[in-house]
A protein has these predicted regions:
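An N-terminal domain-cap segment
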Residues: 1-4
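Active-site helix-to-loop segments that bind/position phosphate- or nucleotide-bearing substrates
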Residues: 8, 21-250
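Short hydrophobic alpha-helical runs that function as membrane-insertion/retention elements
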Residues: 11-17, 21
Length: 250
């Protein structure tokens, strides 16, 4: 009953496991007058447009990774900037993978993203927080979150959220070093600090907005992109020096 009431009010509910990491997500299936139109356009998305959208997403992801390295003073990000400029339609050369190998060794030397360690715990929790609000924004905009642009796993109900989270990941990455501790088990303080990523400011079309606001704008812009068959309609966040809008949160 409690979860149903939350869903009626548009609240995304994260269900936590024993390790305090999100294990499941309940998102509201809010009635939306344009849902049928958006869903039809999403299902009929041409492959070439999907490839263009994915290239734009990955390009911005790598650019934000470069910005994160520069903001954290973790080295020379010029190689990442160069890689961002080589992304082709559909990321056919897997520039994303090349950039990831370089980026994570600069961000946290010795990091293995497959390991269960303190730094990965921080990243994974922060990503899950952003993924949840992004999934909500996509559903309320009329999208079927299981139908991705690039991700197409039949076992993943949130392929589209996993596509669009990519440029947002650096927002978590840039605050992670100040939150990580010696334990892979996150405490209440760490979880609270990671949830605050939603009030972190980013640039959207030259305007400072919170991550929480940015995910709504990304979802709305994707509606225009699939409706008009125009990749340039998609708006994506640009990472800036971390600052938080506590007034919006309160």
């Amino acid at each position: 009953m409690g979860q149903a009431l939350l869903a009626e009010r548009g609240v995304v509910t994260l269900l936590m496991g024993r390790n305090h990491l999100p294990q499941a997500m309940v998102i509201p299936m809010v009635a939306n007058a344009r849902m049928a139109r958006v869903t039809a356009a999403q299902a009929a998305l041409p492959a070439d447009l999907a490839d263009e959208l994915w290239a734009a997403i990955i390009r911005r992801k790598i650019e934000n990774q470069a910005r994160a390295i520069e903001l954290l003073g973790q080295g020379d990000a010029s190689a990442l900037w160069q890689l961002a400029g080589t992304v082709l339609a559909g990321d056919s050369l897997n520039v994303e993978g090349q950039a990831a190998r370089l980026y994570f060794q600069m961000l946290h030397p010795g990091l293995n993203r497959r390991c269960d360690d303190p730094f990965n715990s921080v990243l994974n929790y922060g990503y899950a927080v952003v993924r949840a609000v992004l999934a909500r924004a996509l559903v309320t905009s009329g999208f079927v979150p299981a139908l991705g642009i690039h991700h197409h796993s039949q076992l993943n109900a949130f392929n589209l959220a996993d596509d669009l989270i990519e440029p947002f990941r650096a927002c978590v990455d840039v605050i992670a070093p100040s939150i990580v501790s010696a334990s892979a088990k996150l405490d209440a303080r760490q979880r609270h600090a990671l949830r605050d990523v939603l009030w972190m400011r980013v640039l959207m079309a030259g305007r400072k907005v919170t991550v929480s606001q940015a995910v709504e704008e990304v979802a709305d812009s994707l509606v225009r992109a699939v409706r008009d068959l125009d990749c340039t309609e998609l708006r994506l966040p640009t990472l800036i020096s971390p600052e938080f809008d506590w007034e919006v949160r309160d």
